[in-house]
């Protein structure tokens, strides 16, 4: 029983350490893409994400499973383009 509780607690803690979002480039903007997921998947995995894809409607890479220390784009704190 104790082992089961330990496993469940471990899974919950692992989930807390990951986030999803649009990674930012050096200028604070989303990483742009047009078509295909290979570029975004590579960019996201370089940031230690589990995967990434090109969200075509936003023309930007979206990463899943990013570490907490990676900054992601947020419309509320958008500094892209000197805003």
Curated annotation (Swiss-Prot):
Please state where this protein is localized. Secreted
Any one of the GO CC terms: extracellular region
The answer, when asked if Cytoplasm is one of the entry's keywords, is no
Looking up PROSITE patterns in the UniProt record yields: LCN_CSAB (PS51863)
Q: In which tissues is it expressed?
A: Expressed by the venom gland.
- Domain description from the entry? Has the structural arrangement of an alpha-helix connected to antiparallel beta-sheets by disulfide bonds (CS-alpha/beta).
**Any idea what this protein is called?**
Beta-toxin Ct25
Organism of this sequence: Centruroides tecomanus
């Amino acid at each position: 029983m104790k082992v089961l509780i330990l496993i469940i607690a471990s899974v919950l803690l692992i989930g807390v350490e990951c986030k999803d979002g649009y990674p930012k480039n050096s200028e604070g903007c989303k990483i742009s893409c047009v078509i295909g997921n290979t570029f975004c998947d590579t960019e996201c995995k370089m940031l230690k994400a589990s995967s990434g894809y090109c969200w075509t409607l936003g023309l930007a890479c979206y990463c899943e499973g990013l570490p907490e220390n990676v900054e992601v784009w947020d419309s509320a704190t958008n500094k892209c383009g000197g805003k």
